[in-house]
Every structure is written in C-alpha cells, then in structure tokens.
C-alpha cells in the first residue's frame, strides 16, 4: 500500500509540473462603459500548452486568430483536453483551424473539458496565432 501511495504521489507531481509550463489565459468580462485596450487582451498561442482560468459554468468563448508569417500553407490544430466531468468519456476534441482566419469556439462545456482545479487545458501544434477568452454574461 505504501509503495502504491509513493507511485501515486510521484505521478501527481509529474502532472502538476507539466501544467506549470502552460501559458495561463484569464477570461475577460468586458462591460459597457469600460475602456478596454483590445491589443493587450490577446495572448500568443504556444505549442507548450495553455490553461484557461476564471471558469463560469461553461460560459466562455475562445476567439482565435490564426496567423502565418511564412509561406506555410498550414494552419494550426487546437486540442481541447478532456476533463473529469460526465462527458469526459468523449475524449479530447480537436479543431483544425486554417491559416489567416478568425474562429469563435464555444461556449466551452464544463461537463466535458473542466479539470479538477476548475480550469480548461488546451494545446496547439504550432505557435501561429493569438487568442482571447471571453466570459459571457
């Protein structure tokens, strides 16, 4: 039993260390009459993984703008990581996003993608774009 507990703790620490390398995105909730500098809200996509905080019962949208600075014909793949809810048995969700386009993805399902620590995890296969997360009212 003690050996199993030790193995579990080592695996837990490995998972926690993996999440520490993810870029954290905090969803914004723009309100009427509040000046917001839109340029400061966007976060560059990273291929090392991203983490969305400020979950509000699945009322978030991801707005993703894919950009290509080279002559590449490819866009990016977005993988929403399965969570721990009842629909997590459906697994990860992969979106293929063409280059130089803007996409709105969501509202994000907490019953499929929410993690134990109330976050969403997602990965991009390349760092070609920027995104913003928006909380809906």
Question: What are the roles of these predicted feature ranges?
Answer:
Residues 47-58, 127, 137:
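Extracellular repetitive beta-rich solenoid segments
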Residues 113-137:
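Terminal connector regions
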């Amino acid at each position: 039993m003690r050996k199993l507990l030790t193995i579990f703790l080592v695996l837990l620490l490995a998972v926690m260390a993996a999440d520490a390398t993810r870029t954290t995105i905090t969803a914004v909730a723009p309100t009427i009459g509040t000046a917001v500098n839109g340029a400061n809200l966007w976060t560059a996509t990273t291929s090392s993984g991203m983490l969305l905080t400020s979950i509000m019962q699945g009322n978030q949208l991801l707005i993703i703008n894919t950009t290509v600075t080279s002559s590449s014909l490819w866009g990016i793949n977005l993988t929403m990581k399965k969570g721990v809810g009842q629909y997590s048995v459906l697994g990860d969700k992969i979106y293929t996003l063409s280059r130089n386009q803007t996409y709105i993805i969501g509202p994000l399902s907490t019953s499929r993608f929410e993690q134990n620590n109330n976050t969403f995890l997602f990965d991009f296969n390349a760092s070609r774009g920027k995104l913003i997360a928006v909380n809906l009212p």
